[in-house]
Amino acid sequence: MAHCVTLVQLSVSCDHLIDKDIGSKSDPLCVLLQDVGGGNWTELGRTERVQNCSSPEFSKTLQLEYHFETVQKLRFGIYDIDNKTPELGDDDFLGGAECSLGQIVSSRMLTLPLMLKPGKPAGRGTITVSAQELKDNRVVTMEVEARNLDKKDFLGKSDPFLEFFRQGDGKWHLAYRSEVIKNNLNPTWKRFSVPLQHFCGGDASTPIQVRCSDYDSDGSHDLIGTFHTSLAQLQAAPAEFECIHPEKQQKKKSYKNSGTICVKMCQVETEHSFLDYVMGGCQINFTVGVDFTGSNGDPSSPDSLHYLSPTGVNEYLTALWSVGSVVQDYDSDKLFPAFGFGAQVPPDWQVSHEFALNFNPSNPFCAGIQGIVDAYRQALPQVRLFGPTNFAPIINHVARFAAQAANQRNASQYFVLLLLTDGAVTDVEATREAVVRASYLPMSVIIVGVGCADFEAMEQLDADGGPLHTRSGEAAARDIVQFVPYRRFQNAPREALAQTVLAEVPTQLVSYFRAQGWAPFKPPPPAAKGPAQAPQA
């Protein structure tokens, strides 16, 4: 499971802080806290204290891990420091603000009003936070071939492969090993990329040893030859290096080489990360599809999966809140289309597989996750649960919008469809076709199975064992479906479901944009630095 974990640093500044010192301005410091659950907050770090300043820009940054698949609630507190004790209880509180880390990274620069307590602003005070990923995203990309390698196998040609080692601490450390090319003395290896830090420690002059060997299945690989170089020399590609076998060189005066290694291309490139795309302005468009088929049971019966408990929740709503609360931070307008499928809908009571939950087909958008919840609760008594369970219509619906975004040929939009269902999909072939077509578009599909049905068909859509294929044999470009049964998380912490179903989204998003060759889309920075309405964390 590919969780998106990386280190980010936050830069903080404030404007128009209230003055607590008589005859001078305050001496502010910022402290960062993170919600660790159960109403508890833990301190992650503090900035330096800035003397006599009502609009400080703190030079010390605050560092923390970023996890896409969880809501990381943060609290910033600004204090006027008038003593040397580390405790803040004896210092004046100048205001605070709460938000999620997702809101910060998706906004690029987030400005919030400072509050003394809920509903009481700290004058005109504001706090501005920006994020930067602490990661060297540079990679070394190479294309390498060889000519006239020595024959090492008695009954055939050599089976050559390459190994690149970097020098460090007096040792040679393996940085990359190529695939084996069978029975070939003039091989061309696949293009490959290695993180720059791993390849040479970020230093283009670091000695690099390249070994070419003949593969043996018992592990006793035979050396064909070796040479020494550096990234700086490799970047002069196209370049050729003689492959030398040291023992042969010593024994034979007529020995020239054991072949030639040809570096056709060697470049240092930036391999963009998920945060690069998000902070570059990529909007994640979230759409929900809810199963209203008859197998859910009569919503008025406590046995129904659609039955609303006295607290107003059920498995459908719990799953929606879990996933939606994470994804909503990455969509600036917080307007989410929501659909139902498998029900007879008024006024003609025809079965629909993509009806708007708010019954407004021209504007199916709901305001925030709460808006989807409200639309669901209002739609439930107005439809007749029926069938069958068809996924393809909603997948194709979202795919049409994803195709329009793809036609813009930039990394400005990605689509995530959440399907909540209680049973096996009926239109299996049509759904396979829809998923395969969608795999060529900027979108991912998350399926959460509620109830205790047989979800084997869903597991097949989640093609972890290999690419999904249509009946005609067309293969998916990439794996875009993630399926989990809700019951597996029934007794787990609330955030566990979202952590599992969203874990693959960053990788899926990056793989799509990289395949298209699209760098992060960077819209103009916000025009004004005005305070925003404090979002609900």
UniProtKB/Swiss-Prot annotation:
Recorded domain comment: C2 domains are necessary for calcium-dependent cell membrane association. C2 domains are necessary for neuronal progenitor cell differentiation in a calcium-independent manner.
Database matches in PANTHER family: COPINE, COPINE-1
The UniProt record lists the keyword Transcription regulation: yes
InterPro entries from the UniProt entry: C2_dom (IPR000008), C2_domain_sf (IPR035892), C2B_Copine (IPR037768), Copine (IPR045052), Copine_C (IPR010734), VWF_A (IPR002035), vWFA_dom_sf (IPR036465)
Quaternary structure and interacting proteins, as annotated: Homodimer; homodimerizes via its C2 domains. Interacts with p65/RELA (via N-terminus); this interaction induces proteolytic cleavage of p65/RELA subunit and inhibition of NF-kappa-B transcriptional activity. Interacts (via VWFA domain) with ACTB, CCDC22, MYCBP2, PPP5C, RDX and UBE2O.
Keywords of this entry: Acetylation, Calcium, Cell membrane, Cytoplasm, Differentiation, Membrane, Metal-binding, Nucleus, Repeat, Repressor, Transcription, Transcription regulation
Organism the protein comes from: Bos taurus
Localization terms from the record: Nucleus; Cytoplasm; Cell membrane
Binding site for Ca(2+) 4: 153, 214, 216, 222
UniProt GO molecular function: calcium-dependent phospholipid binding; metal ion binding
Occurrences of domain C2 (ranges): 1-114, 123-245
Residue ranges of domain VWFA in the record: 285-505
Protein's recorded name: Copine-1
Binding, Ca(2+) 1: 21, 27, 80, 82
GO biological process assignments: cell differentiation; cellular response to calcium ion; positive regulation of tumor necrosis factor-mediated signaling pathway; regulation of canonical NF-kappaB signal transduction
Binding site for Ca(2+) 3: 153, 159, 214, 216
Protein's UniProt keywords contain S-adenosyl-L-methionine: no
Tissue specificity field: Expressed in liver, spleen, muscle, testis, adrenal (at protein level).
UniProt cross-references to Pfam families, sorted A to Z: C2, Copine
Recorded GO CC terms: cytoplasm; nucleus; plasma membrane
Protein's gene: CPNE1
Cofactor(s) listed in the protein's UniProt record: Ca(2+)
Family recorded in the similarity comment: Belongs to the copine family.
Primary residence: nucleus
